[in-house]
Amino acid sequence: MSKKEKNVEMGSPMKMPDLASYMQTVIEQLEADKKRSAAHTYTYALKSIAEFYGGAGMPMPVDEVFTPGRLKEYEEWMRREGMRKRKREPKGLSLNTISTYMRNLKAVYHRMVGEKVLPYNPKLFDDVYTKVESQTKRALELEQMNTLLCTDLRKLPSDLRCVLAYFLLMFLFRGMPFIDLAYLRKQDVKGNRIVYSRHKTGRQMTVRIPKEAMELMKEFKNRNPDSIYLFPILHKQESKKKRAGKVKKDKELYMDYLRALRGFNLKLEKIASLLLPAVKLSSYVARHTWATLAFHAGMSIGIISKALGHFSIKVTETYLKPFENEKVDAANEELIISVAGYNEK
């Protein structure tokens, strides 16, 4: 009988893996599978729970982490103490961030259950926040989107022109995410269409290029003949690597994208202050605006879902959920008017 079998027979407790080392293995696998976005969120989830436990290097045995009580303590800590990325912001993470980190932990837990590391508890995450929803309007009104679309780019400061152009192209390309715009290649343009694979899901998308986008593409296209990318969003770092005789790794390219995204969002804030005071602009707004305006124009949720490249209509519904209350309120007003005016008929 082996020592391991003898220990099990005698009832000796099996040593549980540490969450940090286990999650790091998961992150490395995601990196190997080129799932950069997932690896990025898992990395921040690990940093967050490590901070909750007292910092990197502190022991986090998984049988202690994955208990209803400890998960609830972690959730309450995130609501109260979890630091945001921008130090000027108050402590406490948003519900969306809390949900993301909890869902990351839930996925890790299910992986451990599948590997027989931990027993299955179907109610383990019942008391913590794991919802995927949006109660916040990220979409612009029709008039606001029209303001941006009709803006004379020549009147903007030079560093903001291409940023607004990219935002408009994202809207015109059926709410294309910024990451997909950044990774578009010159070869993806097939006549009057763009054929590309979504970075997040790998799903192939075909988008007809509207005439409103033609001029923007012509003016703001990548003019570097050595670059494979359609727009000069990742070109600076790419060129440096080529001059050094090195091939850029996917992970490095993704980090370039994250830097570009941060700069993009900061400049969108400046554009909002100039053109739409009191309105918050971010990379998400173009996508949500397209979905919302399409919804209000009478397009079915099924068509909107397909246009956005969602695998499930449920994902699309989270985009449109903030407007459900508006429809209910409007219907309620019509009902009240109908009842109040009954005797006048």
Residue spans for each PLM region:
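Basic, Lys/Arg- and aromatic-enriched nucleic-acid-binding interface segment
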Residues: 124-178, 182
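Short, basic (Lys/Arg/His-rich) helix/loop patches that form interaction surfaces
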Residues: 155-158, 256, 265-306
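Short, polar N-cap/turn motifs at the start of nucleic acid-interacting alpha helices
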Residues: 187-193, 277-280, 299-318
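DNA/chromatin major-groove-contacting recognition/catalytic segments
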Residues: 208-211, 321-345
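Active-site/catalytic core of tyrosine-dependent DNA strand-transfer enzymes
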Residues: 145, 210-278
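Conserved tyrosine-mediated DNA breakage-rejoining catalytic core shared by Y-recombinases
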Residues: 183-222, 235-236
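Catalytic-site neighborhood detector that most strongly recognizes the C-terminal catalytic loop/helix
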Residues: 139, 198-202, 308-333
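N-terminal core-binding DNA-recognition domain of tyrosine recombinases/integrases
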Residues: 27-37, 47-135, 151-154
